[in-house]
Regions:
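A short, well-structured juxtamembrane/interface segment
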Residues: 118-125
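Major-groove recognition helix of helix-turn-helix-like DNA-binding domains
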Residues: 85-106
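Single, function-defining residue in the core of a domain
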Residues: 1-75, 102-104, 111-115, 131-134, ...
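Extended, structured, electrostatic nucleic-acid-contact surfaces
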Residues: 77-87
Length: 473
């Protein structure tokens, strides 16, 4: 397959010749320019890179996490360099890029995330709807940030007994679409702010009519259930603690029962409670798994309890709701995609200032959404479940596509896009259908003969002396 190469004039400026089709499909330059104008973030001088390209650069920081700050920009222009008339293409230094990021600020990336990241699944998307409702899930995580005084002061460190987390951490709570793994809203806070405080903010502003939100037991409350039903015309399915909502008012045909809740200052809401156990042999094997350090040891006889605002057992049978709640683990996989495969687990966020940390987080979410959007388009084209496409393979394909899009002429872009969509679902890379699997919540820890690093244990530099000057014989 032969493609035409784009032609550049000798007067072309880098800012206008660069093209990011992989990103621009969802973040078109017109939209980014509009947000830059609204946030007064264009800057007085254009310099080597205008702020439009700085926005794309911030998103690319998460797509190419293995590269340092300056190398990310070099990677973005690697295709264009072969067409550039001047062989000595000078690019901004890492310090200059950080300066431009400070000028850009956080609002532009936040508004771009809010405008772009919406639920993407259609009625034809496999696994995206149940009971006529769009499946959503909410969950939180802690992300490590660069160990600087500013980050430590703003975000803080988690502690357990005598031990403190080695790096400052930021609390992130996400609302994601289950079928596509698209994160559609997020809130960030210092690490000591609990998920229970952040989740209501996320639910009140992001949940839309026709959604079924899957929640863990730490988030669900009578107030949230009332708000979802009466104010947002949405529904919830959540796990319950052992002593919650145990006074049955009416037992239904499938064994579930109804309870009326009266949250303070809000309308009463009727909910349905479902109880079930795991088959004894499997439950005993699961009980042998080590539990996390923050949870109780599992009991093989444990009674599992769910609560939902779907009251009709004919419309939503209890067994189907139990199967549906199992889909909440998709948001765990979604968080793993961005922490492990995009951000490369074990490495903190790059930014050394709180404002730039928030900017980087929005860039990370946009990068994850863009990867997932391309995967969803490819899966729908072939009538596949998006779960069958490999996320790591998709990141590699889009990495290569950034180079190819920069080389080809504009009239060739539709053909390159079709090849990209086909590459994403290459048969050899497709994942098998999901299987029922259980794994203990354990991690491998690297052994080290060295002492744990404490706060304040820093090295020092002798700027005016060499090793020869301090040597005594």
């Amino acid at each position: 397959m032969i493609f035409s190469i784009q032609q550049l004039s000798d007067e072309s400026k880098l800012s206008y010749a660069l093209r990011f089709e992989v990103l621009e499909q969802l973040c078109p330059p017109e939209l980014v320019s509009e947000l830059l104008s609204r946030c007064h973030a264009w800057g007085e001088r254009e310099r080597g890179l205008n702020q439009l390209l700085v926005v794309y650069y911030v998103i690319a920081l998460s797509l190419f996490r293995r590269l340092n700050l300056a190398a990310v920009l070099r990677h973005l222009v690697s295709g264009l360099r072969w067409l550039w008339s001047n062989p000595c293409l000078r690019l901004p230094t890492a310090a200059a890029l950080v300066y431009r990021r400070r000028q850009l600020g956080t609002p532009v990336l936040r508004h771009l995330f809010q405008r772009v990241c919406r639920p993407m699944a259609t009625e034809q998307s496999k696994g995206a709807f149940r009971f006529g409702l769009r499946l959503m899930a909410i969950d939180g995580t802690l992300d490590e940030v660069a160990d600087t005084p500013a980050n430590a002061l703003y975000f803080g460190r988690m502690s357990s007994g005598k031990h403190q987390s080695p790096l400052p951490q930021v609390r992130c709570v996400y609302l994601a679409e289950v079928g596509s793994h698209a994160i559609v809203d997020a809130v960030f806070a210092p690490c000591r702010v609990a998920e229970q405080r952040l989740a209501p903010l996320l639910l009140s502003r992001a949940v839309q009519p026709g959604m079924l939100v899957l929640m863990d037991r730490g988030i669900v409350s009578a107030a949230e259930l009332s708000t979802l039903v009466h104010q947002q015309q949405a529904h919830a399915l959540a796990r319950l603690k052992a002593g919650q909502y145990t006074h049955a008012e009416q037992v239904l045909s499938d064994g579930s029962y109804l309870v009326t809740l009266h949250p303070a200052g809000l309308p009463a809401v009727q909910v349905r409670v479902i109880e079930y156990r795991i088959e004894p042999h499997t439950a005993e094997r699961l009980a042998e798994f080590p539990s996390s350090q923050t949870s109780n040891h599992p009991d093989p006889r444990q009674l599992h309890r769910l609560v939902t605002t779907l009251l009709d057992p004919q419309q939503a049978p209890a067994q189907e709701l139990i199967f549906c709640y199992h889909e909440r683990w998709e948001i765990e996989a979604c968080i793993d995609e961005q922490k492990t495969h995009l951000r490369l687990s074990g490495q903190p966020l790059r930014s050394k200032e709180p404002a730039l940390v928030r900017q980087e987080l929005y860039g990370l979410l946009l990068a994850h959404y863009i990867v997932r959007w391309w995967m969803h388009q490819s899966a729908c084209e072939a009538n596949l479940d998006p779960d069958r496409l490999s996320f790591t393979h998709a990141v590699e394909v889009l990495d290569t596509a950034c180079y190819e899009f920069a080389l080809v002429a504009r009239q060739e872009l539709p053909r390159v896009k079709q090849r990209l969509l086909a590459d994403l679902r290459e048969p050899a890379t497709l994942l098998p259908p999901r299987r029922l699997r259980f794994y203990p919540r354990v991690v491998k820890r690297a052994y080290s003969p060295f002492h744990r690093k404490r706060p304040g244990q820093q090295g020092f530099t002798l700027k005016k002396q060499s090793f020869k000057d301090i040597l005594l014989i």
